[in-house]
Design a protein with these regions (language model features):
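N-terminal lobe of the biotin/lipoate ligase/transferase fold
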Residues: 2-141
């Protein structure tokens, strides 16, 4: 699943852990309350711990600190950091570009939908629970 601009904005708005009414969110995003509800269902599929309360709105179970791409780039000035909210696999992203990468180049994401662990087992990484990082480094033989 890709993270559309509307869904990214919803996550940003909800990251404070406070209640936000569907009407308020819809007004801020220029969409209907029904559309807000559909986007919330999609965000739950990413593993976000969202809940709703009649008369109060939607909220995350706990506040969430989202990464700041500019700050990450500043902390790693030697090599580019490719940042994503959602990606299939950080490792696969680098693997597909291996001939164009420089040493230390990395890929960072808040959620992977097709991550792989040891022996090809699925790597579960719901949104907002961790930062996933893969780094390219060429080792001389």
């Amino acid at each position: 699943m890709t993270l559309t601009p509307v869904r990214q904005t919803l996550i940003t708005l909800l990251s404070d852990g406070q209640f936000h009414s569907g009407e308020q969110l819809g007004e801020q995003l220029g969409i209907s309350r029904a559309a807000v509800s559909k986007h919330m269902a999609a965000l739950k599929e990413l593993g976000l711990d969202l809940f709703s309360l009649t008369g109060k709105g939607y909220r995350l179970a706990v506040p969430m600190a989202l990464y700041d791409q500019a700050q990450l780039q500043a902390l790693a000035p030697m090599a580019p950091v490719h940042c994503f909210s959602v990606i299939d696999s950080t490792n696969q992203y680098l693997f597909e570009r291996v001939n164009q990468l420089s040493a230390g180049e990395s890929c960072l994401a808040e959620c992977q939908t097709a991550g792989r662990g040891r022996r090809g087992k699925p790597w579960v990484s719901p949104f907002g629970c961790q930062l996933i990082l893969s780094m390219y480094w060429r080792l001389e033989q």
